[in-house]
Amino acid sequence: MKKFVFLILFFCAAIGMKAQERLGLSGMYGIDREKKIVVATGRLLEGMKPYKESMNVAGETYSYYRSEMPLITITTDGPIVNSPAVHGVINVADADGNVITMHAGFKIRGTSSQQYDKKSYRVELWADETGAEMADTTFLGLRSDDDWNLEAMWAQPLRLRDKVANELWMEMYKLPYAESEPDALPGIRMVYADVFVNEEYMGVYALTERMDRKQLGLRKYNGDIRGVLYKGNGPGAPTFDSLPMYDNTLDTWDNYEWVYPNENDTAINWNHLYSFTNFVMNASDNVFYSQYAAQFDKDNAIDYYLFINSLMAMDNMGRNLFVARYKKSSTYMYLPWDLDAIWGLDTDGSMTYNTAGLMSNGFYDRLTQDCNDYGFVASAQTRYNELRDTLLNREHIMEMVQNQYDELLENGVYDREHEAWPDFTVDENQLTYLSNWLDDRFNYLDGEINAGCGTWGIEVPEPVEGPIRLVEVFPNPAKDRINICFAEDANAVVCLYDMTGRLVQSFAGQNQFLVIPTRNLSKGIYTLVSNVAGNQQVDRVVVE
Protein backbone atom coordinates (compact mmCIF):
# COMPACT_ATOMS: atom_id res chain seq x y z
CA MET A 1 0.00 0.00 0.00
CA LYS A 2 2.82 2.41 0.89
CA LYS A 3 4.51 1.77 -2.45
CA PHE A 4 1.25 2.32 -4.30
CA VAL A 5 0.73 5.67 -2.62
CA PHE A 6 4.30 6.65 -3.35
CA LEU A 7 3.99 5.78 -7.04
CA ILE A 8 0.87 7.90 -7.34
CA LEU A 9 2.61 10.83 -5.68
CA PHE A 10 5.67 10.46 -7.86
CA PHE A 11 3.66 10.13 -11.05
CA CYS A 12 1.54 13.17 -10.25
CA ALA A 13 4.60 15.22 -9.37
CA ALA A 14 6.48 14.17 -12.49
CA ILE A 15 3.77 15.06 -14.99
CA GLY A 16 1.98 17.83 -13.17
CA MET A 17 4.66 20.05 -11.63
CA LYS A 18 4.64 22.56 -14.47
CA ALA A 19 0.91 22.46 -14.99
CA GLN A 20 0.02 23.11 -11.39
CA GLU A 21 -0.20 26.66 -10.15
CA ARG A 22 2.72 27.30 -7.77
CA LEU A 23 0.33 28.28 -5.02
CA GLY A 24 -1.62 25.05 -5.49
CA LEU A 25 1.09 22.53 -4.58
CA SER A 26 0.03 20.07 -1.93
CA GLY A 27 3.22 20.65 0.06
CA MET A 28 2.99 17.30 1.84
CA TYR A 29 5.99 15.77 0.07
CA GLY A 30 9.17 16.81 -1.70
CA ILE A 31 11.16 15.12 -4.46
CA ASP A 32 14.84 15.58 -5.29
CA ARG A 33 15.46 13.88 -8.64
CA GLU A 34 19.22 14.45 -8.51
CA LYS A 35 19.78 12.98 -5.05
CA LYS A 36 16.98 10.43 -5.58
CA ILE A 37 15.24 11.34 -2.33
CA VAL A 38 11.54 11.62 -1.53
CA VAL A 39 10.48 12.99 1.86
CA ALA A 40 6.85 12.96 2.96
CA THR A 41 5.13 14.11 6.12
CA GLY A 42 1.89 12.77 7.55
CA ARG A 43 0.40 11.39 10.70
CA LEU A 44 1.50 7.77 11.18
CA LEU A 45 -0.82 5.03 12.36
CA GLU A 46 -0.74 4.26 16.08
CA GLY A 47 2.31 2.17 16.93
CA MET A 48 3.96 2.95 13.60
CA LYS A 49 7.40 4.55 13.54
CA PRO A 50 9.01 6.77 10.90
CA TYR A 51 10.54 4.65 8.18
CA LYS A 52 12.70 4.59 5.07
CA GLU A 53 12.19 2.47 1.97
CA SER A 54 14.23 1.94 -1.16
CA MET A 55 12.00 2.01 -4.20
CA ASN A 56 12.60 1.38 -7.88
CA VAL A 57 10.83 3.87 -10.10
CA ALA A 58 11.32 3.85 -13.85
CA GLY A 59 14.53 1.91 -13.38
CA GLU A 60 15.96 4.26 -10.76
CA THR A 61 16.25 3.68 -7.01
CA TYR A 62 14.86 6.36 -4.71
CA SER A 63 15.08 6.65 -0.92
CA TYR A 64 11.58 7.29 0.40
CA TYR A 65 11.32 8.75 3.91
CA ARG A 66 8.11 9.08 5.86
CA SER A 67 7.86 10.76 9.26
CA GLU A 68 5.73 13.20 11.20
CA MET A 69 8.35 15.93 10.94
CA PRO A 70 7.05 19.13 9.27
CA LEU A 71 8.00 19.73 5.66
CA ILE A 72 8.92 23.05 4.03
CA THR A 73 9.15 23.39 0.26
CA ILE A 74 10.48 26.59 -1.31
CA THR A 75 10.36 27.60 -4.97
CA THR A 76 12.05 30.84 -6.01
CA ASP A 77 12.26 32.95 -9.16
CA GLY A 78 16.05 32.91 -9.06
CA PRO A 79 19.05 31.96 -6.93
CA ILE A 80 18.94 32.94 -3.26
CA VAL A 81 21.69 35.42 -2.43
CA ASN A 82 22.74 37.53 0.52
CA SER A 83 20.86 40.58 -0.76
CA PRO A 84 18.39 41.54 -2.10
CA ALA A 85 15.65 39.09 -1.19
CA VAL A 86 14.44 37.01 -4.14
CA HIS A 87 10.73 36.34 -4.57
CA GLY A 88 9.39 32.84 -4.18
CA VAL A 89 6.68 30.71 -2.64
CA ILE A 90 6.95 28.81 0.64
CA ASN A 91 4.79 25.85 1.67
CA VAL A 92 4.85 24.77 5.31
CA ALA A 93 3.09 21.48 6.05
CA ASP A 94 2.56 19.64 9.31
CA ALA A 95 1.77 15.97 9.83
CA ASP A 96 -1.96 16.65 10.21
CA GLY A 97 -2.22 17.87 6.63
CA ASN A 98 -2.29 21.59 7.40
CA VAL A 99 -0.46 23.41 4.61
CA ILE A 100 0.22 27.14 4.58
CA THR A 101 1.31 28.66 1.28
CA MET A 102 2.70 32.20 1.12
CA HIS A 103 4.58 34.54 -1.17
CA ALA A 104 7.94 35.37 0.42
CA GLY A 105 11.31 36.98 -0.06
CA PHE A 106 14.35 34.79 0.61
CA LYS A 107 17.98 35.66 1.30
CA ILE A 108 21.00 34.00 2.88
CA ARG A 109 21.52 34.98 6.51
CA GLY A 110 24.58 34.94 8.74
CA THR A 111 28.19 35.77 7.99
CA SER A 112 29.47 32.22 8.51
CA SER A 113 26.61 30.69 6.50
CA GLN A 114 28.02 32.22 3.32
CA GLN A 115 30.95 29.77 3.30
CA TYR A 116 28.94 26.59 3.90
CA ASP A 117 27.23 24.47 1.25
CA LYS A 118 24.13 24.27 3.43
CA LYS A 119 22.97 27.86 3.83
CA SER A 120 20.81 29.46 6.50
CA TYR A 121 17.98 31.62 5.21
CA ARG A 122 15.92 34.60 6.23
CA VAL A 123 12.28 34.42 5.11
CA GLU A 124 10.10 37.53 4.79
CA LEU A 125 6.43 36.79 4.16
CA TRP A 126 4.86 38.98 1.48
CA ALA A 127 1.22 39.84 0.77
CA ASP A 128 1.88 39.26 -2.96
CA GLU A 129 4.74 38.76 -5.39
CA THR A 130 5.73 42.43 -5.35
CA GLY A 131 6.84 42.43 -1.71
CA ALA A 132 5.35 45.89 -1.25
CA GLU A 133 3.51 44.75 1.87
CA MET A 134 4.41 42.16 4.49
CA ALA A 135 2.00 39.48 5.71
CA ASP A 136 1.87 37.84 9.14
CA THR A 137 1.08 34.18 9.69
CA THR A 138 1.81 31.50 12.27
CA PHE A 139 3.83 28.38 11.49
CA LEU A 140 3.94 25.11 13.43
CA GLY A 141 2.68 26.48 16.74
CA LEU A 142 5.06 29.43 16.79
CA ARG A 143 4.04 33.08 17.00
CA SER A 144 2.32 34.99 14.20
CA ASP A 145 4.85 37.07 12.27
CA ASP A 146 6.11 38.07 8.83
CA ASP A 147 9.82 37.45 9.48
CA TRP A 148 11.42 34.03 10.05
CA ASN A 149 14.77 32.27 10.04
CA LEU A 150 15.67 28.85 8.68
CA GLU A 151 18.78 27.68 10.53
CA ALA A 152 21.00 25.17 8.72
CA MET A 153 22.86 24.10 11.91
CA TRP A 154 25.82 23.19 9.69
CA ALA A 155 28.44 23.75 12.41
CA GLN A 156 26.54 21.67 14.98
CA PRO A 157 27.55 17.98 14.68
CA LEU A 158 24.36 16.73 16.37
CA ARG A 159 22.12 19.48 14.97
CA LEU A 160 20.81 20.34 18.43
CA ARG A 161 23.08 22.61 20.46
CA ASP A 162 21.40 25.91 19.53
CA LYS A 163 17.91 24.56 20.10
CA VAL A 164 18.64 22.91 23.44
CA ALA A 165 20.59 25.93 24.70
CA ASN A 166 17.73 28.31 23.85
CA GLU A 167 15.31 26.04 25.69
CA LEU A 168 17.67 25.96 28.69
CA TRP A 169 17.87 29.78 28.70
CA MET A 170 14.08 30.11 28.70
CA GLU A 171 13.86 27.59 31.54
CA MET A 172 16.39 29.60 33.49
CA TYR A 173 15.46 33.23 32.85
CA LYS A 174 12.11 35.02 33.12
CA LEU A 175 11.57 38.57 31.90
CA PRO A 176 11.14 41.03 34.79
CA TYR A 177 7.93 42.37 33.22
CA ALA A 178 6.45 38.94 32.39
CA GLU A 179 3.25 39.61 34.33
CA SER A 180 2.56 42.70 32.22
CA GLU A 181 3.52 40.95 28.96
CA PRO A 182 2.51 37.27 29.35
CA ASP A 183 3.19 36.44 25.68
CA ALA A 184 6.71 37.87 25.72
CA LEU A 185 9.67 35.48 25.67
CA PRO A 186 13.35 36.07 26.55
CA GLY A 187 14.50 33.80 23.73
CA ILE A 188 13.42 32.17 20.50
CA ARG A 189 11.61 28.91 19.87
CA MET A 190 12.73 26.49 17.17
CA VAL A 191 10.93 23.70 15.29
CA TYR A 192 12.69 21.13 13.10
CA ALA A 193 11.53 20.67 9.50
CA ASP A 194 12.71 18.98 6.31
CA VAL A 195 13.46 21.61 3.65
CA PHE A 196 13.43 21.52 -0.15
CA VAL A 197 14.66 24.53 -2.14
CA ASN A 198 13.84 24.52 -5.85
CA GLU A 199 13.34 20.75 -5.79
CA GLU A 200 16.69 20.14 -4.07
CA TYR A 201 16.57 18.41 -0.70
CA MET A 202 18.60 20.58 1.69
CA GLY A 203 18.28 18.44 4.81
CA VAL A 204 16.76 19.24 8.18
CA TYR A 205 16.54 22.85 9.35
CA ALA A 206 15.26 24.65 12.41
CA LEU A 207 12.47 27.13 11.67
CA THR A 208 12.96 29.86 14.26
CA GLU A 209 11.34 32.97 15.54
CA ARG A 210 13.35 36.18 15.46
CA MET A 211 14.50 38.28 18.38
CA ASP A 212 12.59 41.54 17.99
CA ARG A 213 10.14 43.91 19.65
CA LYS A 214 7.27 41.44 19.35
CA GLN A 215 9.21 38.50 20.82
CA LEU A 216 10.30 40.54 23.83
CA GLY A 217 7.04 42.45 24.25
CA LEU A 218 8.82 45.81 24.22
CA ARG A 219 6.72 48.96 24.42
CA LYS A 220 5.96 50.37 20.99
CA TYR A 221 7.33 53.60 19.62
CA ASN A 222 4.70 56.37 19.83
CA GLY A 223 6.72 59.33 18.68
CA ASP A 224 8.84 58.89 21.78
CA ILE A 225 11.43 56.14 22.19
CA ARG A 226 10.22 53.69 24.85
CA GLY A 227 11.22 50.09 24.20
CA VAL A 228 14.58 49.73 22.44
CA LEU A 229 16.58 46.86 21.00
CA TYR A 230 20.20 46.77 19.85
CA LYS A 231 22.27 43.89 18.48
CA GLY A 232 25.95 43.47 19.30
CA ASN A 233 28.04 42.37 16.32
CA GLY A 234 31.60 42.32 17.64
CA PRO A 235 34.29 43.96 19.78
CA GLY A 236 34.23 47.69 20.42
CA ALA A 237 31.40 49.43 22.21
CA PRO A 238 29.57 46.07 22.75
CA THR A 239 32.57 44.80 24.72
CA PHE A 240 33.18 48.22 26.35
CA ASP A 241 36.58 48.63 24.73
CA SER A 242 35.95 51.76 22.68
CA LEU A 243 33.70 54.80 22.79
CA PRO A 244 33.65 56.65 19.47
CA MET A 245 31.13 59.38 18.82
CA TYR A 246 27.85 58.25 17.25
CA ASP A 247 25.89 59.51 14.25
CA ASN A 248 22.10 59.43 14.58
CA THR A 249 21.71 59.29 10.81
CA LEU A 250 23.22 55.78 10.85
CA ASP A 251 21.67 52.55 12.12
CA THR A 252 25.06 51.23 13.28
CA TRP A 253 27.49 52.42 15.91
CA ASP A 254 30.85 50.75 16.60
CA ASN A 255 29.59 47.16 16.07
CA TYR A 256 26.13 47.84 17.48
CA GLU A 257 23.15 47.55 15.15
CA TRP A 258 19.96 49.52 15.80
CA VAL A 259 17.03 47.06 15.67
CA TYR A 260 14.06 48.87 17.23
CA PRO A 261 12.34 51.35 16.94
CA ASN A 262 12.41 51.00 13.16
CA GLU A 263 9.31 52.95 12.15
CA ASN A 264 11.37 55.74 10.60
CA ASP A 265 14.91 57.05 10.47
CA THR A 266 14.20 59.81 12.98
CA ALA A 267 13.62 57.17 15.67
CA ILE A 268 17.37 56.46 15.86
CA ASN A 269 19.10 58.01 18.85
CA TRP A 270 22.27 56.42 20.18
CA ASN A 271 22.68 58.84 23.07
CA HIS A 272 21.28 56.58 25.81
CA LEU A 273 23.41 53.56 24.88
CA TYR A 274 26.44 55.80 24.44
CA SER A 275 25.88 57.22 27.94
CA PHE A 276 25.61 53.75 29.45
CA THR A 277 28.77 52.58 27.68
CA ASN A 278 30.59 55.69 28.88
CA PHE A 279 29.35 55.03 32.42
CA VAL A 280 30.70 51.46 32.39
CA MET A 281 34.04 52.47 30.94
CA ASN A 282 34.74 55.67 32.84
CA ALA A 283 32.72 55.92 36.06
CA SER A 284 34.69 55.78 39.30
CA ASP A 285 34.32 52.63 41.37
CA ASN A 286 32.15 54.39 43.94
CA VAL A 287 29.80 55.70 41.27
CA PHE A 288 29.77 52.49 39.23
CA TYR A 289 29.04 50.08 42.07
CA SER A 290 26.37 52.29 43.60
CA GLN A 291 24.57 53.04 40.34
CA TYR A 292 24.97 50.20 37.80
CA ALA A 293 21.84 48.38 39.01
CA ALA A 294 19.78 51.48 38.20
CA GLN A 295 20.89 51.22 34.56
CA PHE A 296 21.20 47.48 33.94
CA ASP A 297 18.95 44.78 35.41
CA LYS A 298 21.15 43.04 37.98
CA ASP A 299 19.26 39.74 37.94
CA ASN A 300 19.53 39.60 34.17
CA ALA A 301 23.25 40.40 34.30
CA ILE A 302 23.75 37.53 36.73
CA ASP A 303 21.71 34.99 34.79
CA TYR A 304 23.28 35.90 31.45
CA TYR A 305 26.79 35.65 32.91
CA LEU A 306 26.12 32.26 34.50
CA PHE A 307 24.35 30.96 31.40
CA ILE A 308 27.06 32.01 28.94
CA ASN A 309 29.79 30.63 31.19
CA SER A 310 27.97 27.35 31.76
CA LEU A 311 27.86 26.95 27.98
CA MET A 312 31.33 28.46 27.59
CA ALA A 313 29.80 30.27 24.62
CA MET A 314 32.76 31.42 22.55
CA ASP A 315 31.04 34.23 20.69
CA ASN A 316 28.36 35.83 22.89
CA MET A 317 29.91 38.57 25.01
CA GLY A 318 30.06 41.27 22.34
CA ARG A 319 28.82 39.51 19.25
CA ASN A 320 25.61 37.47 19.02
CA LEU A 321 23.83 39.24 21.85
CA PHE A 322 20.96 41.70 22.11
CA VAL A 323 20.65 44.62 24.49
CA ALA A 324 17.03 45.50 25.23
CA ARG A 325 14.98 47.93 27.29
CA TYR A 326 11.28 47.28 27.96
CA LYS A 327 10.18 50.90 28.32
CA LYS A 328 11.69 54.32 28.88
CA SER A 329 12.01 53.92 32.66
CA SER A 330 13.36 50.35 32.47
CA THR A 331 16.92 49.09 32.83
CA TYR A 332 18.87 47.33 30.10
CA MET A 333 19.12 43.54 29.80
CA TYR A 334 21.06 40.99 27.72
CA LEU A 335 19.51 38.31 25.49
CA PRO A 336 21.55 35.56 23.75
CA TRP A 337 21.63 34.78 20.03
CA ASP A 338 23.24 32.13 17.77
CA LEU A 339 24.20 29.63 20.45
CA ASP A 340 26.19 27.20 18.33
CA ALA A 341 29.81 27.68 19.48
CA ILE A 342 29.09 26.20 22.91
CA TRP A 343 29.73 23.12 25.04
CA GLY A 344 33.18 22.37 23.66
CA LEU A 345 32.66 23.50 20.05
CA ASP A 346 34.38 26.34 18.24
CA THR A 347 32.58 28.64 15.79
CA ASP A 348 33.34 26.30 12.87
CA GLY A 349 31.94 23.26 14.69
CA SER A 350 35.33 21.75 15.55
CA MET A 351 35.83 20.28 19.00
CA THR A 352 37.87 22.38 21.43
CA TYR A 353 38.01 20.70 24.81
CA ASN A 354 38.41 23.97 26.65
CA THR A 355 36.80 23.96 30.10
CA ALA A 356 38.79 26.64 31.94
CA GLY A 357 38.43 30.40 31.82
CA LEU A 358 35.54 32.83 32.14
CA MET A 359 33.72 34.51 29.28
CA SER A 360 33.56 38.23 29.97
CA ASN A 361 33.49 41.76 28.60
CA GLY A 362 34.31 45.18 30.03
CA PHE A 363 31.00 45.36 31.89
CA TYR A 364 31.48 42.00 33.59
CA ASP A 365 35.14 42.74 34.29
CA ARG A 366 33.88 45.47 36.61
CA LEU A 367 30.88 43.59 37.96
CA THR A 368 33.04 40.69 39.11
CA GLN A 369 34.95 43.13 41.31
CA ASP A 370 31.74 44.16 43.13
CA CYS A 371 32.53 42.74 46.56
CA ASN A 372 29.74 44.39 48.54
CA ASP A 373 27.72 42.13 50.82
CA TYR A 374 24.80 42.13 48.39
CA GLY A 375 26.81 43.00 45.31
CA PHE A 376 27.15 41.20 42.02
CA VAL A 377 29.58 38.51 43.18
CA ALA A 378 27.66 37.52 46.33
CA SER A 379 24.36 37.48 44.43
CA ALA A 380 25.86 35.52 41.53
CA GLN A 381 27.29 32.92 43.90
CA THR A 382 23.89 32.42 45.53
CA ARG A 383 22.12 32.18 42.17
CA TYR A 384 24.74 29.81 40.74
CA ASN A 385 24.41 27.37 43.62
CA GLU A 386 20.61 27.44 43.31
CA LEU A 387 20.84 26.66 39.60
CA ARG A 388 23.40 23.89 40.13
CA ASP A 389 20.71 21.96 42.00
CA THR A 390 18.11 22.42 39.26
CA LEU A 391 19.14 23.42 35.73
CA LEU A 392 22.88 23.99 35.49
CA ASN A 393 24.19 20.48 35.96
CA ARG A 394 25.30 17.65 33.72
CA GLU A 395 22.29 15.46 34.48
CA HIS A 396 19.65 17.99 33.49
CA ILE A 397 21.43 19.23 30.38
CA MET A 398 22.28 15.72 29.17
CA GLU A 399 18.64 14.69 29.66
CA MET A 400 17.60 17.57 27.39
CA VAL A 401 20.28 16.68 24.85
CA GLN A 402 19.51 12.95 24.92
CA ASN A 403 15.78 13.51 24.45
CA GLN A 404 16.41 15.76 21.46
CA TYR A 405 18.97 13.36 20.00
CA ASP A 406 16.58 10.41 20.35
CA GLU A 407 13.81 12.35 18.60
CA LEU A 408 16.07 13.25 15.68
CA LEU A 409 17.43 9.72 15.45
CA GLU A 410 13.97 8.11 15.51
CA ASN A 411 12.72 10.46 12.81
CA GLY A 412 15.59 9.52 10.51
CA VAL A 413 17.05 13.02 10.55
CA TYR A 414 20.67 11.91 10.64
CA ASP A 415 20.17 9.46 7.76
CA ARG A 416 18.58 12.18 5.64
CA GLU A 417 21.31 14.68 6.50
CA HIS A 418 23.85 12.16 5.25
CA GLU A 419 21.93 11.62 2.01
CA ALA A 420 21.69 15.37 1.47
CA TRP A 421 25.29 16.05 2.54
CA PRO A 422 27.43 12.87 2.20
CA ASP A 423 30.29 14.35 4.26
CA PHE A 424 27.97 14.50 7.28
CA THR A 425 27.90 11.51 9.61
CA VAL A 426 26.52 11.45 13.10
CA ASP A 427 28.89 10.26 15.81
CA GLU A 428 27.23 9.02 18.98
CA ASN A 429 30.55 9.60 20.76
CA GLN A 430 29.62 13.28 20.64
CA LEU A 431 27.21 12.56 23.50
CA THR A 432 30.02 11.14 25.63
CA TYR A 433 32.24 14.07 24.68
CA LEU A 434 29.56 16.54 25.76
CA SER A 435 28.84 14.70 29.01
CA ASN A 436 32.52 14.65 29.97
CA TRP A 437 32.91 18.28 28.96
CA LEU A 438 30.00 19.33 31.18
CA ASP A 439 31.49 17.47 34.15
CA ASP A 440 34.83 19.19 33.73
CA ARG A 441 33.33 22.60 33.06
CA PHE A 442 31.06 22.56 36.11
CA ASN A 443 33.92 21.29 38.27
CA TYR A 444 35.89 24.33 37.15
CA LEU A 445 32.99 26.75 37.69
CA ASP A 446 32.21 25.30 41.13
CA GLY A 447 35.66 26.30 42.29
CA GLU A 448 35.86 29.57 40.38
CA ILE A 449 32.41 31.03 41.13
CA ASN A 450 32.60 30.10 44.80
CA ALA A 451 36.11 31.52 45.20
CA GLY A 452 36.76 34.79 46.94
CA CYS A 453 35.51 38.01 45.41
CA GLY A 454 37.89 39.65 42.98
CA THR A 455 39.64 36.39 42.05
CA TRP A 456 37.38 35.05 39.30
CA GLY A 457 39.46 33.85 36.37
CA ILE A 458 42.60 35.59 37.62
CA GLU A 459 45.82 33.59 37.50
CA VAL A 460 49.34 34.94 37.11
CA PRO A 461 51.56 32.67 34.99
CA GLU A 462 55.22 32.32 35.93
CA PRO A 463 57.51 32.62 32.88
CA VAL A 464 60.44 30.26 32.48
CA GLU A 465 63.84 31.36 31.28
CA GLY A 466 65.91 29.70 28.61
CA PRO A 467 66.68 29.92 24.90
CA ILE A 468 64.88 26.75 23.79
CA ARG A 469 61.60 27.45 21.97
CA LEU A 470 58.98 24.77 22.53
CA VAL A 471 56.35 26.55 20.49
CA GLU A 472 56.18 28.87 17.48
CA VAL A 473 53.40 31.47 17.65
CA PHE A 474 52.27 33.35 14.54
CA PRO A 475 51.16 35.76 13.23
CA ASN A 476 52.04 38.38 15.79
CA PRO A 477 50.24 40.79 15.72
CA ALA A 478 47.18 38.60 15.13
CA LYS A 479 43.84 39.61 13.66
CA ASP A 480 41.54 36.59 13.25
CA ARG A 481 43.52 33.78 14.86
CA ILE A 482 46.70 32.79 16.63
CA ASN A 483 48.48 29.81 15.10
CA ILE A 484 50.51 27.67 17.48
CA CYS A 485 52.99 25.11 16.18
CA PHE A 486 54.60 22.70 18.66
CA ALA A 487 58.02 21.17 18.08
CA GLU A 488 56.44 17.71 18.12
CA ASP A 489 53.21 15.93 18.97
CA ALA A 490 52.74 16.04 22.73
CA ASN A 491 50.12 16.63 25.37
CA ALA A 492 49.91 20.40 25.51
CA VAL A 493 47.85 22.95 27.40
CA VAL A 494 47.77 26.53 26.14
CA CYS A 495 46.34 29.39 28.22
CA LEU A 496 45.66 32.94 27.06
CA TYR A 497 45.56 35.76 29.64
CA ASP A 498 44.65 39.42 29.27
CA MET A 499 46.67 42.25 30.80
CA THR A 500 44.83 41.98 34.13
CA GLY A 501 45.97 38.37 34.50
CA ARG A 502 42.47 37.05 33.80
CA LEU A 503 42.37 33.69 32.04
CA VAL A 504 40.52 34.35 28.78
CA GLN A 505 40.78 31.00 27.00
CA SER A 506 42.51 27.67 27.43
CA PHE A 507 43.01 24.80 25.02
CA ALA A 508 44.30 21.27 25.38
CA GLY A 509 45.44 19.03 22.55
CA GLN A 510 47.75 16.30 21.35
CA ASN A 511 48.41 17.58 17.84
CA GLN A 512 51.38 19.53 16.55
CA PHE A 513 49.23 22.45 15.44
CA LEU A 514 46.61 24.50 17.32
CA VAL A 515 44.51 27.51 16.32
CA ILE A 516 43.07 30.04 18.78
CA PRO A 517 40.30 32.24 17.30
CA THR A 518 40.67 35.89 18.27
CA ARG A 519 37.81 37.65 16.50
CA ASN A 520 35.84 37.91 19.75
CA LEU A 521 38.80 39.29 21.71
CA SER A 522 39.36 42.95 22.40
CA LYS A 523 42.40 44.60 20.87
CA GLY A 524 45.43 44.62 23.13
CA ILE A 525 48.39 42.65 24.47
CA TYR A 526 47.84 39.11 25.75
CA THR A 527 50.03 36.58 27.51
CA LEU A 528 50.15 33.13 25.93
CA VAL A 529 51.39 30.37 28.25
CA SER A 530 52.16 27.02 26.62
CA ASN A 531 52.77 23.97 28.81
CA VAL A 532 54.27 21.05 26.88
CA ALA A 533 55.47 17.83 28.49
CA GLY A 534 56.18 19.57 31.79
CA ASN A 535 57.92 22.56 30.22
CA GLN A 536 56.52 26.07 29.95
CA GLN A 537 56.93 28.87 27.43
CA VAL A 538 55.49 32.39 27.77
CA ASP A 539 54.84 34.68 24.80
CA ARG A 540 53.31 38.13 24.46
CA VAL A 541 50.83 38.37 21.60
CA VAL A 542 49.26 41.51 20.17
CA VAL A 543 45.66 41.21 18.97
CA GLU A 544 44.67 43.88 16.47
Predicted features, each with a name:
Residues 1-21, 485:
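Bacterial Sec-dependent N-terminal signal peptides
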Residues 20-107, 395, 399-402, 407-457:
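Regulatory N- and C-terminal appendages and interdomain linkers associated
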Residues 88, 119-121, 490-495:
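Short beta-strand/loop motifs in extracellular/secreted proteins, especially
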Residues 92, 99-152:
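Conserved oxyanion/phosphate-binding beta-strand-loop segments in alpha/beta enzyme cores
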Residues 127-132, 136-155, 159, 171, ...:
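Internal "kinase-insert"/substrate-recognition segments embedded within catalytic cores
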Residues 450-474:
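Residue-level detector of functionally pivotal "anchor" positions at catalytic/ligand-binding pockets or at interdomain
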